[in-house]
From Swiss-Prot:
One GO BP annotation of this record: heme biosynthetic process
One cellular component term from this protein's GO annotations in UniProt: cytoplasm
Protein name, UniProt field: Ferrochelatase
NCBIfam families found in the cross-reference section: hemH (TIGR00109)
Family per record: Belongs to the ferrochelatase family.
Gene Ontology molecular function terms on file: ferrochelatase activity; metal ion binding
InterPro entries reported for this sequence: Ferrochelatase (IPR001015), Ferrochelatase_AS (IPR019772), Ferrochelatase_C (IPR033644), Ferrochelatase_N (IPR033659)
Pathway it works in: Porphyrin-containing compound metabolism; protoheme biosynthesis; protoheme from protoporphyrin-IX: step 1/1
Entry's EC annotation: 4.98.1.1
Catalytic activity: heme b + 2 H(+) = protoporphyrin IX + Fe(2+)
Taxonomic path: Bacteria, Bacillati, Cyanobacteriota, Cyanophyceae, Synechococcales
Domain of life: Bacteria
Residues bound to Fe cation: 196, 281
Location(s) in or outside the cell: Cytoplasm
Amino acid sequence: MARVGVLLMNLGGPERIQDVGPFLFNIFADPEIIRLPNPALQRPLAWLISTLRSSKSEQAYRSIGGGSPLRRITEQQARELQSLLRQRGIDATSYVAMRYWHPFTESAVADIKADGIDQVVVLPLYPHFSISTSGSSFRELQRLRQTDESFRKLPIRCIRSWYDHPGYVRAMAELIAEQVRLSDVPEEAQVFFSAHGVPKSYVEQAGDPYQKEIEACTTLIMAELENLLGYGNPHSLAYQSRVGPEEWIQPYTDQVIEQLGEAGTRDLVVVPISFVSEHIETLAELDIEYRELATEAGIVHFRRVPALDTYPTFIEGLADLVGSSLEGPEINLDEAAKLAGRVKFYPQERWQWGLNTSSEAWNGRIAMLGFAAFLLELISGHGPLHAIGLL
């Protein structure tokens, strides 16, 4: 029997306050998150942004206990998925690959090779594909394949997205139904889906299918919810977590909450649709920030649907996905990362400091130039960082 490695890909998160700055640096150093015309600027800019944002982010993590639970939950998901797959007769071992914090993708790949795995199923824990989530993780795997001959020889099957998978849709509907039934008048409860946003340019210029998949997923979940409850609920969809000056896909979560309050909504059932684990966006942004906003807007009951975590229906759905991937047509890394639109992909190679004397000089000049601009803006109180809310 072939030994199957199931590679669960996720974002990662700082487990301690002192990890917040390095974690943010890793995010902003990813060219799929901030796209620059000159790759040499990537790391200096990542350092600058992570330095400026660390204090605010540290405060948010302190508000939820001092660190992200994402790794712990993802490892629990991996263990339960592995157990269920083995019960189904699949000789599977689960591995966790985080994009921006430990355990990194390189570590998971090293474990896969050390364990003598025969083939790999790549399962991103993002139901909906986006350049900045699944896309970036697939591209990191491509980079590792190019630089590691033994890993390159290993057969890989990818699951690109699974927003429409019955197990996922059913699990979401079941958890929503539990919260709707708690309302004073359940059939009048407003089901409010909040998804992580992405820049509008990703969708319109790069062909990112994320928004279409989110909208289609919402429709599927509401249909399943109506089947469970026997009645339909009003619902709405918005996008959260936007940063910077660029326009993101709309409507925005904070604006829709205010509009619902003005319209007289009393019972709000909030659904974190693009998150399968509890982390900073659910525990701080939704549970604290948006709960306060809803109260100010006049909404009486704010009920947040828990993230899927290790909910049995969800784990069963993940096992079904792995089984279908093994039995169905192969989707390789190139196919999984492909986009319909024209977009320039930037190399995922980590930019090395000090490759030679010339590069060291340019690194120093760039860093000094950025630092000088930063000091000038601090002194003057005006500049692009103030304009986008970083200072």
